[in-house]
Amino acid sequence: MWSILKAVRENPEILYESQRRRGLSVDIVDRAIELDRKWREELKRVNQLRKRRNELARAVKEAKGEERAKVIEEAKAVSEEVKRAEEELKRLEAELEEVLLSIPNIIHESVPVGKDDSENVPIKYWGKAKVYFEDVDAFVEMTQGMAEYEVTDVKPIGHADAVEIFGWADLERAAKVAGARFYYLLNDLVWLDFALTMYALDFLRKEDFTIVSPPYMMRREAYSGVTAFSDFEEVIYKVEDEDLYLIATSEHPIAAMHMREVLEERELPLLYAGVSPCFRKEAGAHGKDTKGIFRVHQFNKVEQFVFCLPEQSWEWHEKLIENVEKLWQGLGIPYRIVNICTGDLGIVAAKKYDLEAWMPAQAKYREMVSCSNCTDWQSYRLDIRFAEERGKPSKGFVHTLNSTAIATTRAITAIIENFQLEDGRVEIPRVLRKYLEPIESAPKDFIMPAKSQ
């Protein structure tokens, strides 16, 4: 049984508490409980009427004369009543389903309560951050003394300025061609983008993930199963006059990959590493990161995705963020792990971690990775179940999890700020060099300012 319906029937207090912690009204839970009660009562009534109809059908065969005419008349009346009751049952079922689908995922008990992203809770710091001497006090206050750091006398040029000053990207011409938040990556940054992708895929393949290049477009039916589409529609691009939408992340087509399937227990978990471009309108981001390549309409990303048994999902949530940490430790970029609070969580996830990289030019941590356990929120909508074997009764809905591995343009911004030298060169993380060495024209040790190439 779907966890939200199970809670409605067996333990509604879980839903009440989840809604309260999210800062949302509990009225939707009351409505679901009432509709479910009415639906079950109507189902009982329909079954009783069907039973009576069957009894009368048998009685018609045995009755004779005037008695038979009376039985036929009653049978017709009951049949009409069955029809009306079935229509009412269908109406109640549709209304109940609509209400249930509007209830956000049940929040895990470890999610901190908070109103917005300012109340997300850092739970771990890694690496020694390079902190400009004027930013030290703010850094110590921000990290509450939990993070290591080294003081620097020179503040790096911010990534947004660096990519243009050193000729690594052309945003002005991209704006002329496609509008704001687009870019042309040039030469060394193109190679770096490729190397980051190969690094993440190579790592995940060694962890037994199946590498997937998914469709870059999805139908509305599939998209509605992976996200709250009415809220998400303003974020994605629609193909005009087609029932197709450009994907915002490979998570979405991979989540829908097993739509309307029953998976065997023995084949779970299914581990996928998706690689794709991502297309986002960035609605609601007006005024945020308007320069550079940090917040853009199109970017490349490697994504982790897991289908697993319900009892495995919390273990896998920790494993996915562990994979991410290994990748970012390999890059040598200081970061922190943040437990996302209730007000910033969104309705799909039961719990989410973010990995935020230290950006020395901005003197702040910035989001690079989101890692979510969606439990059975997506699988119920997509009708992805599990059973002991195919053909045997379903035991329930699988759990789905997703996590960024590396979003390449964001990773590039972190590399530029953390490994920038005074002469403008940027040291390439050692773990990426083996993916560049076989290519004669690719940079090997440093990204060079264009004038020095």
Swiss-Prot record:
| Subcellular location per the Swiss-Prot or TrEMBL entry | Cytoplasm
Q: Where does L-serine bind?
A: T249, S250, E251, E303, T404
Task: Read off the InterPro entries from this record.
Answer: aa-tRNA-synt_IIb (IPR002314), aa-tRNA-synth_II (IPR006195), aa-tRNA-synth_II/BPL/LPL (IPR045864), Ser-tRNA-ligase_type_1 (IPR002317), Ser-tRNA-synth_1_N (IPR015866), SerRS_1_N_sf (IPR042103), SerRS_core (IPR033729), tRNA-bd_arm (IPR010978)
Which SUPFAM superfamilies does this chain map to?
Class II aaRS and biotin synthetases (SSF55681), tRNA-binding arm (SSF46589)
Annotated coiled-coil segments of the chain: none
What's this protein's function?
Catalyzes the attachment of serine to tRNA(Ser). Is also able to aminoacylate tRNA(Sec) with serine, to form the misacylated tRNA L-seryl-tRNA(Sec), which will be further converted into selenocysteinyl-tRNA(Sec).
Pfam families recorded: Seryl_tRNA_N (PF02403), tRNA-synt_2b (PF00587)
What keywords is this UniProt entry annotated with? Aminoacyl-tRNA synthetase, ATP-binding, Cytoplasm, Ligase, Nucleotide-binding, Protein biosynthesis
**Name of the protein described by the UniProt record:** Serine--tRNA ligase
Q: In which pathway does it act?
A: Aminoacyl-tRNA biosynthesis; selenocysteinyl-tRNA(Sec) biosynthesis; L-seryl-tRNA(Sec) from L-serine and tRNA(Sec): step 1/1
Enzyme category, top tier:
ligase
Subunit structure of this entry?
A: Homodimer. The tRNA molecule binds across the dimer.
Q: Which family does it belong to?
A: Belongs to the class-II aminoacyl-tRNA synthetase family. Type-1 seryl-tRNA synthetase subfamily.
Q: Which EC numbers characterise this protein's activity in its record? A: 6.1.1.11
Q: Which reaction does it catalyse?
A: tRNA(Ser) + L-serine + ATP = L-seryl-tRNA(Ser) + AMP + diphosphate + H(+); tRNA(Sec) + L-serine + ATP = L-seryl-tRNA(Sec) + AMP + diphosphate + H(+)
What the entry lists under Gene3D superfamilies is as follows: Bira Bifunctional Protein, Domain 2, Serine-tRNA synthetase, tRNA binding domain
List positions binding ATP.
R280, K281, E282, V296, E367, M368, V369, S370
Q: Which organism is it from?
A: Archaeoglobus fulgidus (strain ATCC 49558 / DSM 4304 / JCM 9628 / NBRC 100126 / VC-16)
Annotated Gene Ontology cellular components are: cytoplasm
